[in-house]
From Swiss-Prot:
Source domain of life: Bacteria
Pfam families: Trypsin (PF00089)
Residues the record marks as active site: 74, 113, 189
Predominant place of localization: secreted
Gene: splA
Top class in the EC scheme: hydrolase
Keywords tagged on the record: Hydrolase, Protease, Secreted, Serine protease, Signal
Family annotation (Gene3D superfamilies): Trypsin-like serine proteases (2.40.10.10)
Keyword Protease: yes
Name of the featured protein: Serine protease SplA
Length: 235
């Protein structure tokens, strides 16, 4: 990848206590001791659902509509987001979908770590964003013990933005909060959490534990959150 596109920067999965969710999480039951480590590298991300996943400096996002990406607020608010381009489904061997400048950001007005990022349609290479990505569909819902996958860019610059997918199980859902045991590392913030049909349940926003995150947490997409996202998809 062009060094001007993805520069080495902060790729930390946000520390749990630094988030507004921390006060809610402390009261939630946690049933797992260590995350599953079922992880595989996605070397060719040109097919669904992988071609809907994008890399930011320090995080991940998922495409949900025309020029529209969902990620975390703490990724969208990064000082680097307007300086560095968004890379569409970059992988180590497959053909990437281009590198795009950020147009604007719409933060969710509530405490949830959720934001919309709009990109310019034409990449620096002359590619069309919407012809080189897929749009991930929303799931109707999810429940405890459902199997999930998390796709993203753990350790971003350290791995030269290789894409990885991990699998696990939902352990708890309460309102817009969910806990699961799919393995995650710094750089997975904003990663889509998908069901077995590759439908979007929510996005990862934090983890606890050291190198092997013992618990991982996501923003669960309730009807209200899905409405916010759908209302901010470019027409």
């Amino acid at each position: 990848m062009n060094k001007n596109v993805m520069v080495k920067g902060l790729t930390a999965l946000t520390i749990l206590t630094s988030l507004g969710f921390a006060e809610n999480i402390s009261n939630q039951p946690h049933s797992i001791a260590k995350a599953e480590k079922n992880v595989k590298e996605i070397t060719d991300a040109t097919k669904e659902p992988y071609n809907s996943v994008v890399a930011f400096v320090g995080g991940t996002g998922v495409v949900v509509g025309k020029n529209t990406i969902v990620t975390n607020k703490h990724i969208a608010k990064s000082n680097d987001i307007f300086k560095n381009r968004v890379s569409a489904h970059h992988s180590s061997k497959g053909k990437g979908g281009g590198n795009y400048d950020v147009k604007d950001i719409v933060e969710y007005p509530g405490k949830e770590d959720l934001a919309i990022v709009h990109v310019h349609e034409t990449s620096t290479e002359g590619l069309n964003f919407n012809k080189n990505v897929s749009y991930t569909k929303f799931a109707d819902g999810a429940k405890v013990k459902d199997r999930i996958s998390v796709i993203g860019y753990p350790k971003g610059a350290q791995t030269k933005y290789k894409m990885f997918e991990s699998t696990g199980t939902i352990n708890h859902i309460s309102g817009t909060f969910m806990e699961f045991d799919a393995y995650a590392q710094p750089g997975n913030s904003g990663s889509p959490v998908l069901n077995s049909k590759h439908e979007l349940i929510g996005i990862l926003y934090a983890g606890s534990g050291k190198d092997e995150s013992e618990k991982n947490f996501g923003v669960y997409f309730t009807p209200q959150l899905k409405e916010f996202i759908q209302n901010n998809i470019e027409k």
